[in-house]
C-alpha cells in the first residue's frame, strides 16, 4: 500500500507543473490578443481622425492568427465568444484589405477610387468602434470577453 501511495504522489507531482504551465500559456495568449486589440483601436482612431486615405500602417492581427487557434483547441472559448471575437477581428482584416487596396489606388494615382476606398474604410472603422445601423460596436463585446478571460483566477482555467 505504501508503494502505491508513493507512486500516486509521484504521478501527481509530475503532472502539477504541466497544469500550471497550461494555465500560464492560455493567459499569455489572451494578453497578446488584448494588446493587439488595444493597438488596433488606436490605429482605427487615427484612421478616422487623420484623414489620410492610404496610410502605411495596418491593424495588427498576428496574435489573433497565432493565439486564437490554440485557445480554440484548448476549449477556452464558447461558440458565442468565438462569434464575437471573430466578427471583431474579421472587421480588422477587412479594414487591412481596404487599406491595401487604397494603397494600390494611391500608387496608380487614381484619386477617385482612393477617396471611395477611404470612405469605405472609415465606414468599416466606425462599425468596428461604434457600431452601425443601431447595432453595437464589434470591438467592445470582444474586448469584454477577452478582459473577462484574463481576469479569471489561475485555478479556474
Show where each model-derived region lies.
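Juxtamembrane membrane-water interface segments immediately C-terminal to a transmembrane helix
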Residues: 20-38, 42
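Primarily heptad-repeat coiled-coil rod domains in cytosolic scaffolding/tethering proteins
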Residues: 14, 21, 28, 73-76, ...
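Histidine (H) residue identity feature
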Residues: 15, 29-31, 118
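Interfacial alpha-helical end/capping and short helix-turn segments at domain and membrane boundaries
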Residues: 35-157
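Membrane-embedded hydrophobic alpha-helical segments
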Residues: 1-23
Amino acid at each position: 500500500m505504501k508503494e502505491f501511495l508513493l507512486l500516486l504522489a509521484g504521478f501527481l507531482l509530475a503532472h502539477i507543473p504541466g497544469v500550471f504551465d497550461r494555465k500560464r500559456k492560455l493567459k499569455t495568449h489572451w494578453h497578446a490578443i488584448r494588446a493587439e486589440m488595444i493597438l488596433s483601436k488606436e490605429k482605427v482612431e487615427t484612421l478616422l481622425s487623420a484623414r489620410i486615405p492610404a496610410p502605411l500602417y495596418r491593424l495588427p492581427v498576428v496574435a489573433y492568427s497565432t493565439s486564437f487557434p490554440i485557445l480554440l483547441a484548448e476549449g477556452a472559448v464558447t461558440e458565442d465568444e468565438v462569434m464575437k471575437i471573430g466578427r471583431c477581428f474579421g472587421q480588422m482584416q477587412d479594414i487591412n484589405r481596404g487599406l491595401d487596396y487604397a494603397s494600390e489606388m494611391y500608387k496608380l494615382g487614381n484619386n477617385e477610387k482612393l477617396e471611395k476606398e477611404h470612405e469605405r474604410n472609415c465606414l468599416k472603422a466606425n462599425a468596428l468602434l461604434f457600431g452601425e445601423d443601431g447595432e453595437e460596436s464589434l470591438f467592445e463585446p470582444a474586448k469584454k470577453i477577452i478582459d473577462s478571460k484574463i481576469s479569471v483566477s489561475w485555478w479556474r482555467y
